């Protein structure tokens, strides 16, 4: 069901400072910057070997990322695993009583943090940054 770790999302207070730190310390480059009004954050994607680090700065304190920052401070928010059969994996998890958010027809799903000791787990097809 789970393949390689392909995403590590880190919640930060100041995305500009975090970008500077990750690029200076690790030699990473920003591949994409964006904003999700639906989920209440701005982000930056920094490709790594087989996946990427995603920096998330909340824009809405009432959405999940904002609540995470208020409760936990900065830190790891989500781990994304490569998954070749998302619909099948979602079905198996739901059969086991696991709360999973999957939108029909999308190649991504999320396991609720309460199911796995507070860690937000994402199932996704691997993105390549060549």
Locations of regions flagged by a protein language model:
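N-terminal beta-strand motif that seeds the catalytic metal site of vicinal oxygen chelate
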Residues: 1-19, 74-81, 129-130
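Short glycine/proline-centered loop/turn elements that form peptide/ligand docking sites
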Residues: 17, 35-39
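Short strand-coil-strand connectors
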Residues: 13, 47-49
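Amphipathic alpha-helical segments
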Residues: 14-29, 89-96
């Amino acid at each position: 069901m789970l393949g390689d770790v392909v995403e590590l999302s880190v919640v930060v207070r100041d995305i500009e400072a975090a970008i500077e730190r990750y690029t200076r310390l690790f030699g990473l480059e920003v591949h994409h910057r964006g904003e999700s009004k639906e989920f209440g954050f701005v982000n930056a994607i920094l490709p790594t070997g087989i996946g990427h680090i995603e920096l998330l700065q909340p824009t809405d304190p009432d959405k999940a990322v904002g609540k995470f920052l208020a409760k936990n401070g900065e830190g790891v928010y989500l781990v994304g695993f490569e998954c070749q059969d998302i619909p099948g994996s979602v079905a198996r998890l739901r059969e086991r009583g696991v709360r999973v958010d999957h939108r029909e027809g999308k190649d991504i799903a999320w396991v609720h943090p309460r199911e796995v000791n507070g860690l937000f787990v994402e199932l996704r097809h691997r993105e390549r940054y060549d």
